[in-house]
Amino acid sequence: AHSKNVKLIMHHETSASATNYERWLDSAFKLMKEHGYDAVKTGYVGNIIPRGEHHYSQWMINHYQRVVDKAAEYKIMVNSHESVRPSGLSRTYPNWIAAEAARGTEFEAMGGNNPDHTTILPFTRFMGGPMDYTPGIFQTQYNYYDANSKNFANTTLAKQLGLYVVMYSPLQMACDLPENYERHLDAFQFIKDVAVDWDDTKILSAEPGDYIHTARKAKGSENWFVGGVTDEN
């Protein structure tokens, strides 16, 4: 990856053992710096350890803060998943570049998000800070992988592209398989071209639960990008 000028993001899936993660934070971040990693995606899937604590308890809120503090010492960016909803701390800690803290695209593989979900988040979850929604589904029919499957993602390719403008995150993901992008290189070019940070944002039209259309001016550029998402209607 380094020889091709490609940066990697390390994933620290703690399996909800927050106490164990804190014991190894220094060692983990030192390893990252030694190998050229400057960003980490943290995860907390499962029941929190210490027992009796919850993802949104005071102890865990302080834990997320401790992780970001320690990461800042090593000049490492944090993209936290399964964490508490942001409350503006990304302005104090710019290395806390994004968080999940709501139902993201991964839920399309677990029953799906309602189509209106993405028209509501900009007025709720996004008020606290950037979200790693992880858009980019190009193959929406699951029978492509399993001939007996009748499931599908509640989205369209065009909507997935619109999410890169509507859903603000300075660290964007492309969640599908490379082979699915290779079949739609024209659409994938938009993901490569779209900015991830902005100088100006204008909401062109919106109705929570129905639709939102957003225009954003790329940071340090005169280029504007326009994206929109709707519900099932």
Where would I find each of the regions flagged by the language model?
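Short catalytic-loop micro-motif centered on adjacent basic/acidic residues
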Residues: 79, 176, 225-227
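Catalytic cores of secreted or luminal carbohydrate-active enzymes
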Residues: 158-207
